[in-house]
C-alpha cells in the first residue's frame, strides 16, 4: 500500500491449488482470484468447462486462467492437449463473462489463431514479450496487453518500443510474482508492491507522469475485470 498498490489478482495455475488462491481472496478485500490450469501444468487434474464455470461463480473469482500456449519446453507437434485445454478455458470465459489471463510463449501464431477461432470475448495477454505485429493482432481481437518487470530490463529495448504503441485504454501492468523482479530489485524475490516500478518505467516510455499512468492502468483493470 505504501507504493499505492490497492488491489491485485492472485492467479491460479492448477485446480489442486484453487482453494488456497480463493481463500486468500476471501480473506483480503484487496486480493482477487482467477481459476484455471497453466499450459505447462502436468500431473494435475485436467479442467473441463463445467468445473471451471462452477469455480467462476464466486464473486471473488474475476478471471479465467492462467491459460494459453507454451512451446518453450514442449514441441508444437506434441501440444494438441495444450491447445485443447486452451479452447476449454476460452469456452469457460465466454460463458461466464469473466476475462481470460492468456499466457503465450513461443506460440504467437497458434495463440492468436485459437483466440480468433473460438471468438474469445475478453482477456489480457499476460506478461507480454512479443512483437508489435502480435500485439496488434491481439488488440484487434479485443485483448488488453500487460507488461511485467521485463519492461525495466536493459535487454528489453524492443519491448519498450512495443509498449509505446499500445493504446492507453488497453494497457495493464503486473509483476508475475515471484518471478521477473523489476529493476532496481532484479535478482531478489518479487512482490506485488513492485508493480509500481513497472508503472514508473511505462510512464517514462510513454512520456507521461507516474500518477497519470497509474490512473490509466487502474481504470483499465477495473474496466476489464469489473465492468
Role assignments for model-derived ranges:
Residues 1-227:
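Mid-domain alpha/beta scaffold segments of enzyme catalytic cores
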Amino acid at each position: 500500500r505504501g507504493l499505492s498498490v490497492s488491489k491485485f489478482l492472485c492467479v491460479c495455475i492448477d485446480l489442486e491449488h484453487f482453494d488456497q488462491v480463493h481463500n486468500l481472496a476471501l480473506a483480503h478485500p484487496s486480493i482477487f482470484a482467477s481459476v484455471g490450469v497453466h499450459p505447462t501444468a502436468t500431473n494435475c487434474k485436467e479442467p473441463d468447462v463445467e468445473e471451471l464455470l462452477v469455480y467462476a461463480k464466486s464473486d471473488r473469482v474475476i478471471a479465467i486462467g492462467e491459460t494459453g500456449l507454451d512451446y518453450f519446453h514442449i514441441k508444437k507437434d506434441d501440444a494438441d492437449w495444450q491447445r485443447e485445454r486452451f479452447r476449454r478455458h476460452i469456452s469457460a470465459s465466454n460463458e461466464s463473462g469473466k476475462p481470460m489471463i492468456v499466457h503465450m510463449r513461443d506460440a504467437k501464431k497458434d495463440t492468436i489463431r485459437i483466440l480468433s477461432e473460438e471468438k474469445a470475448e475478453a482477456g489480457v495477454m499476460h506478461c507480454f514479450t512479443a512483437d508489435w505485429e502480435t500485439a496488434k493482432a491481439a488488440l484487434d481481437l479485443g485483448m488488453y496487453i500487460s507488461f511485467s518487470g521485463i519492461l525495466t530490463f536493459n535487454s528489453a529495448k524492443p519491448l519498450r518500443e512495443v509498449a509505446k504503441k499500445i493504446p492507453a485504454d488497453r494497457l495493464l501492468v503486473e509483476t508475475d510474482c515471484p518471478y521477473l523482479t523489476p529493476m532496481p530489485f532484479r535478482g531478489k524475490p518479487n512482490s506485488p508492491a513492485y508493480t509500481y516500478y513497472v508503472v514508473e518505467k511505462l510512464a517514462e516510455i510513454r512520456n507521461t507522469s507516474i500518477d497519470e499512468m497509474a490512473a490509466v492502468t487502474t481504470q483499465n483493470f477495473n474496466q476489464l475485470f469489473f465492468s
